[in-house]
Regions:
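Non-catalytic terminal and connector segments of soluble metabolic enzymes
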Residues: 9, 17, 47, 54-55, ...
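NAD(P)+-binding Rossmann beta1-loop-alpha1 motif at the extreme N-terminus of oxidoreductases
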Residues: 1-53, 119, 178-181
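Residues forming the Rossmann-fold NAD(P)(H) cofactor-binding site
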Residues: 16, 69, 93
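Short, conserved loop/helix-junction motifs that constitute active-site signature segments
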Residues: 75-81, 99-102
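Rossmann-like NAD(P)-binding element
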Residues: 50-79
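Internal alpha-helical scaffold of NAD(P)-dependent oxidoreductase catalytic cores
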Residues: 95-105, 121-157, 167-194
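ADP-ribose/adenylate-binding Rossmann-like module
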Residues: 79-92
């Protein structure tokens, strides 16, 4: 059986974790947009964004919201039957479709930082095309636990599962710094970060 070609446009931390996990099951490609230098050492091939859109069966959009319009408009002419999976926070599916020139095979998802451990929750926005949602779920279930939610609930999911871990990491980091600044020994400082 031939492996599907999966491409990532943008390669920040979430994309990097997804690439690491999915590279055993799929042929992975990534564009040179927002490349995390660690991606250079992965089992993935670097392509120009337009070439990635032509070659891949599934395209992950993993860029910051402020460049999403530019990315989708740049690949819109290449989209035919590909599944486009968005990891972009705060942009609705209808807006993504508009930015892609009306292309409808787009599924909005929101992963959490736990995808690096294959156990984080991942939200998938419910939509009219169950087959696209099912196809998305098959792929991203390798990254964590999937939950199909009404799209109106995706932003709340993002706030809780996206910002929540970052908040607690900041608290732990602050506690560690306070411990070190107070002259606690390394083991005591480590206890403060637990």
């Amino acid at each position: 059986m031939n492996k599907q070609n999966i491409g990532f446009i943008g390669c920040g931390n979430l994309a990097l974790q997804a690439i690491k996990t999915l590279s055993g099951s799929y042929n992975i490609f990534y564009s040179n947009l927002s490349i995390n230098q660690a991606a250079e050492n992965l089992a993935a091939e670097k392509l120009e964004t337009i070439d990635l859109a032509k070659k891949c069966d599934v395209i992950f959009i993993t860029v910051k919201p402020n460049v999403t319009a530019e990315v989708l408009s740049s690949i819109a002419s290449q989209l035919q039957n590909q599944l486009v999976i968005s990891f972009v926070a705060g942009i609705s599916r209808s807006k993504l479709v508009d930015l892609a020139g009306g292309y409808k095979n787009i599924v909005r998802t929101m992963p959490s930082l736990g995808i690096g451990f294959k156990n984080g929750p991942i939200a998938i926005a419910e939509m009219g095309d169950k087959a696209l949602v099912d196809q998305t779920e098959v792929i991203i279930s390798e990254l964590g636990s999937t939950y199909v939610l009404e799209e109106k609930d995706i932003d709340a999911f993002t706030a809780i599962y996206g910002a929540g871990p970052a908040y607690f990491a900041l608290v732990a980091e602050t506690m560690s710094k306070l411990a070190a600044d107070s002259g606690l020994s390394l083991p005591d400082k480590d206890l403060a970060s637990v």
